[in-house]
């Protein structure tokens, strides 16, 4: 099949705001420096829903969404040297070419090699590998895991331990890695520190896990849904609070609880007002606040400059700061050695045909991650 078109099932988003449609598509062979992957498992993330909603300024249709997946290499294009058919892999929405100035700088993981074409929903040569009903279908985040087969750039693939369970480690393609890395890489949480995590979805839970691994002594979870508190405590939160239970602002509450503010705070929602609260809950002189959540297009953050003049630091993170190709295999190893949790993020499994139900579960607030088995 290596040089042939593959016919398979995919969940196509024909237009914004409509449910995904399971269709038969054609997947073209990989071109030079591309890899065709048989997806074994994929999860549904809020980023997929954000683009499907039509709110994403980079969102283009028709498209095959999905960016938390894992699978097996089916074939490779010309010039691919580090991967071969049969390799177990996780596709990556932030690549690592190893050559651009971003890859060569230890301070960032934001490889720019294929950014322009990826943002347009195309492969690096400016075309698509997907066709449905005679029409080209766009790629998404360079991964498009909502398909039985996908084609990705060879710099957007992490080769992992073949014994890893793909219906679990697919989650390391986005949410868990993002939250965990926000704590250990971006914030660099210190032993004995006090942390506050705003938003207790999958990413927030991963931040809590990272804070615990880093040795934080106090981890305060914050959410308006108290049903999420028990799970947060399982992941390492020492206490949880609901902002709606207080008459004063949440930053005032946290400052009182912590004798002046927290050492590290994390916004895992994508709400610019909460981003301000998280910054202002950080301790004067040394507090660090990390923006993890992705705000809607056009939103702006604000605070009084005095908050920064008096020693607080405001930072952002993408994919937890991990240089992807080299780091994801290590994260899989950490999971296999039980240093980090992954299984506990999976709240359900569904067949691929039930993908729209997985979106409904996510919107209900009762699920962390639903994994689809292809």
Curated annotation (Swiss-Prot):
This is Alcohol dehydrogenase class-3. Its cofactor is Zn(2+). Keywords: Acetylation, Cytoplasm, Lipid metabolism, Metal-binding, NAD, Oxidoreductase, Phosphoprotein, Zinc. CDD domains: alcohol_DH_class_III. Belongs to the zinc-containing alcohol dehydrogenase family. Class-III subfamily. The record marks 115 as: Important for FDH activity and activation by fatty acids. Zn(2+) 2 binds at residues 97, 100, 103, 111. Binds 2 Zn(2+) ions per subunit. It catalyses: a primary alcohol + NAD(+) = an aldehyde + NADH + H(+); a secondary alcohol + NAD(+) = a ketone + NADH + H(+); S-(hydroxymethyl)glutathione + NADP(+) = S-formylglutathione + NADPH + H(+); S-(hydroxymethyl)glutathione + NAD(+) = S-formylglutathione + NADH + H(+). GO terms for biological process: ethanol catabolic process; fatty acid omega-oxidation; formaldehyde catabolic process; positive regulation of blood pressure; respiratory system process; response to lipopolysaccharide; response to nitrosative stress; response to redox state. The gene is Adh5. Pfam families: ADH_N, ADH_zinc_N. InterPro entries: ADH-like_C, ADH-like_N, ADH_3, ADH_Zn_CS, GroES-like_sf, NAD(P)-bd_dom_sf.
